[in-house]
């Protein structure tokens, strides 16, 4: 079989639950953890006579989201009805924005430094404010389903990209970046595991018609450009074949794996000369395959009509500017700040600190605490500030993750960690001893001053040279064979003896001081 040259084009539709206190058009509270059907107002279940009242907090969050994603904000907030019949939609229509979305023509920047993919901008076609549906689950009786209306009416922000993706690395980087932006903006938790962020994927393939740079592209055996590698200069493509929408993808891993399978499925059919329908498909994360759900619907099928119960709301320039002023610094700005100037931390450390909003705020609080101490000389401060990112991103996050996969690093308050780092810089605590002490503090948190805890748990640095000397001599005598090898010139054993002595002293002595004692013992024996 002779294969053509194919490339995939991928577009995303993301639904974000906004972190409002109340629902979009009713006074019911938003609480994903509440017992089923306990956060429901009359309008949420479309009881006759109930009317929608727009939640101003949801509108503000939507405008904030549009600004955070570099969109042009609409001059008016106007809603439409999207009609379709499904049990989780009691009114028979969803209130959304078809004619005038809240934001258009935005973009999310991706960079090699922060996002670990080639520098690019992902165009946002539009974002719209709409209501979520009820949550349906299967009942024991297969002819029935269970409906929880707690979710019905929760404000959603739908974000639609152009079909500009050609590889899964950029797709996953985009999704993680979007999560980071909306979390720092304070408008959504964007947790995919509980439905707070849901992703649909549009996948199509097209023939490669340009002959430039083909040698630089990685074609798989079936003739398609691999979706595994990011490509800076993508070739010109012909007419797209039938587009398939992949629905209900619950995490980034499923998004990536569903794209891989669907691209290969479409290419296999195309190579055999078989066409396929434009349809909606699901993804089975056990088999790793997509499966048909229903035929693809068009806009006409939904019979969009204006929502006459909610009058248009003018979004004045002063209102939009006031929302813009409330927007905090976002990841790209913070990455630039962290990796330059007085901070100048590594890209890897900055990426970790910005991967979770709480990590960044933890770092900022610890940094300001160290920087504000007046009785510490400047060189010690600079040393502590230089090593602080390591202690947070590697030692603290790493050790807390051993206990909890979704770590709460505030189990050790930032001021306590700052004091530990300062003591290491002052050489009142060795790095090895500090790591052991930090582990004990994570397991048994305490509000006592760090200096008191170190004394109580006997973690302070051993400055007594006689004690270090005695411990070194004890270690050397226990391992006389290796000491003989050392005396005969096997100098690599010096580090080995230092490690053994460090273990005996619980890391409380400086490796440099221990090595000096080992060298002294070696000279005496010679």
Curated annotation (Swiss-Prot):
Chief localization:
mitochondrion
**Which is one Gene Ontology cellular component term of this protein?**
glutamyl-tRNA(Gln) amidotransferase complex
For this UniProt record, the keywords arranged alphabetically read as follows: ATP-binding, Ligase, Mitochondrion, Nucleotide-binding, Protein biosynthesis
Matches recorded under SUPFAM superfamilies: GatB/YqeY motif, Glutamine synthetase/guanido kinase
| Catalytic reaction list | L-glutamyl-tRNA(Gln) + L-glutamine + ATP + H2O = L-glutaminyl-tRNA(Gln) + L-glutamate + ADP + phosphate + H(+)
Q: Name one Pfam family in it.
A: GatB_N
* Ribonucleoprotein listed as a keyword: no
Q: What is its EC number?
A: 6.3.5.-
Q: Where in the cell is it found?
A: Mitochondrion
GO MF terms, alphabetically ordered: ATP binding; glutaminyl-tRNA synthase (glutamine-hydrolyzing) activity
Disulfide links within the chain: none
Tell me the InterPro entries matching this sequence.
Asn/Gln-tRNA_amidoTrfase_suB/E (IPR017959), Asn/Gln-tRNA_Trfase_suB/E_cat (IPR006075), Asn/Gln_amidotransferase (IPR018027), Asn/Gln_tRNA_amidoTrase-B-like (IPR003789), GatB (IPR004413), GatB_Yqey_C_2 (IPR023168), Gln-tRNA_amidoTrfase_suB_CS (IPR017958), Gln_synth/guanido_kin_cat_dom (IPR014746)
Q: Name one GO biological process term.
A: glutaminyl-tRNAGln biosynthesis via transamidation
Q: Which residues form a coiled coil?
A: none
Q: Which family does it belong to?
A: Belongs to the GatB/GatE family. GatB subfamily.
State its role.
Answer: Allows the formation of correctly charged Gln-tRNA(Gln) through the transamidation of misacylated Glu-tRNA(Gln) in the mitochondria. The reaction takes place in the presence of glutamine and ATP through an activated gamma-phospho-Glu-tRNA(Gln).
Further comment: This protein may be expected to contain an N-terminal transit peptide but none has been predicted.
The UniProt subunit note reads as follows: Subunit of the heterotrimeric GatCAB amidotransferase (AdT) complex, composed of A, B and C subunits.
What's this protein's name? Glutamyl-tRNA(Gln) amidotransferase subunit B, mitochondrial
Query: Which organism is this protein's natural source?
Result: Schizosaccharomyces pombe (strain 972 / ATCC 24843) (Fission yeast)
**What taxonomic ancestry is recorded?**
Eukaryota, Fungi, Dikarya, Ascomycota, Taphrinomycotina
């Amino acid at each position: 079989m002779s294969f053509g040259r194919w490339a995939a084009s991928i577009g995303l539709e993301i639904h974000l639950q906004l972190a409002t206190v109340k629902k979009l058009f009713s006074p019911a509270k938003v609480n994903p953890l509440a017992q089923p059907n306990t956060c429901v107002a009359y309008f949420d279940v479309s009881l006759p006579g109930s009317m929608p009242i727009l939640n101003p907090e949801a509108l503000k969050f939507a405008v904030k989201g549009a600004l955070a994603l570099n969109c042009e904000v609409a001059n008016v907030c106007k809603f439409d009805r999207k009609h379709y019949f499904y049990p989780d939609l009691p009114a028979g229509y969803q209130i959304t924005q078809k004619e005038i979305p809240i934001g258009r023509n935005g973009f999310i920047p991706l960079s090699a430094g922060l996002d670990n993919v080639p520098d690019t901008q992902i165009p946002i076609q539009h974002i719209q404010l709409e209501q979520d549906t009820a949550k349906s689950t299967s009942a024991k009786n297969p002819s029935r389903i269970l409906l929880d209306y707690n979710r019905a009416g929760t404000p959603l922000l739908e974000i639609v990209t152009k079909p500009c993706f050609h590889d899964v690395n950029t797709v996953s980087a985009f999704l993680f970046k979007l999560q980071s932006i909306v979390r720092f903006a304070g408008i959504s938790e964007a947790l995919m595991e509980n439905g707070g962020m849901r992703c649909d994927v549009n996948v199509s393939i097209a023939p490669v018609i340009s002959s430039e740079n083909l040698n630089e592209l990685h074609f798989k055996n079936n003739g398609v450009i691999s979706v595994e590698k990011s490509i800076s200069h993508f070739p010109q493509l012909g007419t797209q074949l039938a587009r398939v929408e992949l629905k209900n993808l619950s995490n980034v891993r499923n998004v990536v794996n569903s794209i891989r399978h669907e691209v290969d499925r479409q290419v296999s059919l195309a190579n055999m000369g078989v066409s396929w329908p434009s349809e909606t498909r699901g993804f089975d994360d056990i088999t790793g395959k997509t499966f048909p759900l229903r035929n693809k619907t068009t806009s006409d099928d939904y019979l969009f009509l204006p929502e006459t119960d909610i009058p248009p709301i003018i979004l004045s320039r002063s209102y939009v500017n006031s929302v813009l002023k409330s927007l905090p610094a976002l990841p790209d700005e913070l990455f630039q700040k962290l990796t330059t100037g007085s901070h100048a931390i590594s890209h890897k450390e900055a990426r970790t600190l910005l991967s979770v909003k709480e990590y960044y705020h933890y770092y900022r609080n610890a940094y300001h605490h160290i920087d504000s101490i007046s009785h510490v000389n400047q060189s010690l401060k600079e040393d502590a500030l230089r090593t602080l990112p390591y202690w947070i991103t590697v030692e603290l996050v790493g050790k807390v993750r051993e206990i909890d996969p979704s770590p709460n690093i505030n189990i050790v308050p930032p001021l306590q960690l700052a004091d530990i780092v300062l003591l290491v810089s002052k050489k009142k605590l060795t790095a090895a001893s500090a790591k052991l002490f930090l582990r004990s503090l994570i397991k048994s948190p305490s509000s006592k001053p760090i200096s008191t805890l170190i004394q109580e748990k006997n973690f302070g640095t051993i400055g007594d040279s006689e004690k270090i000397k005695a411990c070194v001599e004890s270690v050397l005598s226990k391992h006389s064979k290796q000491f003989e090898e050392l005396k005969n010139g096997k100098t690599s054993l010096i580090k080995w003896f230092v490690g053994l002595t460090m273990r005996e002293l619980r890391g409380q002595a400086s490796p440099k001081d221990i090595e000096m004692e080992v060298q002294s013992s070696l000279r005496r024996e010679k």
